[in-house]
């Protein structure tokens, strides 16, 4: 799924669209996506000028956007739908390496549980197969 298709399923836009491509989807189960991190990202202007590092909260947001696409595809919502899923919680977040300009972030989300509209995911972000971040994410329809 390319960027044009991604924009049909989630409402995020520049500068807050943090997924470039979806490379694998298993409805109701998992999704793998990528984010190409470039020096032109607006957040690098202030985080940090001497050594640009992608903010951890934006890595978490990237995982949440991947989860959002998985929800939409799992529920068979049509392109251009108006549903928005919001964070309901983030648990057990850990950051293991920095993400810098030039890195390609691989984002993997797996459905752990769906109950009464609350979706719980396991998220993992890696660079060159090295763990950058992991967290459990919860989302609910807004």
Curated annotation (Swiss-Prot):
GO biological process, one term: lipid A biosynthetic process
Statement: the UniProt record of this protein carries the keyword DNA repair: no
Catalysed reactions, as listed in the record: a (3R)-hydroxyacyl-[ACP] = a (2E)-enoyl-[ACP] + H2O
Keyword annotations: Cytoplasm, Lipid A biosynthesis, Lipid biosynthesis, Lipid metabolism, Lyase
Molecular function per GO: (3R)-hydroxyacyl-[acyl-carrier-protein] dehydratase activity
Residues forming the catalytic site: 47
Keyword field contains Transcription regulation: no
EC number, UniProt record: 4.2.1.59
Entry GO CC: cytoplasm; membrane
Lineage: superkingdom: Bacteria
Localization (cell): Cytoplasm
PANTHER family found in the cross-reference section: 3-HYDROXYACYL-[ACYL-CARRIER-PROTEIN] DEHYDRATASE (PTHR30272:SF1)
Function: Involved in unsaturated fatty acids biosynthesis. Catalyzes the dehydration of short chain beta-hydroxyacyl-ACPs and long chain saturated and unsaturated beta-hydroxyacyl-ACPs.
Family as reported in the entry's similarity comment: Belongs to the thioester dehydratase family. FabZ subfamily.
Protein name: 3-hydroxyacyl-[acyl-carrier-protein] dehydratase FabZ
Name of the gene: fabZ
């Amino acid at each position: 799924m390319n960027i044009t298709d991604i924009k049909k399923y989630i409402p995020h836009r520049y500068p807050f669209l943090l997924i470039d491509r979806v490379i694998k989807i298993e409805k109701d189960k998992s999704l793998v996506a990528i984010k190409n991190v470039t020096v032109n990202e607006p957040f690098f202007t202030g985080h940090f000028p001497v050594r640009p590092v992608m903010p951890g909260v934006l890595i978490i947001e990237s995982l949440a956007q991947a989860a959002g696409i998985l929800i939409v595809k799992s529920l068979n919502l049509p392109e251009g739908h108006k549903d928005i899923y919001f964070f309901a919680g983030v648990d057990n977040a850990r950051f293991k390496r920095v993400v810098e300009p030039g890195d390609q972030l691989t984002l993997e989300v797996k459905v752990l549980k769906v109950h009464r509209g609350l979706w719980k995911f396991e998220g993992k972000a890696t660079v060159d197969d090295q763990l950058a971040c992991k967290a459990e994410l919860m989302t609910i329809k807004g």
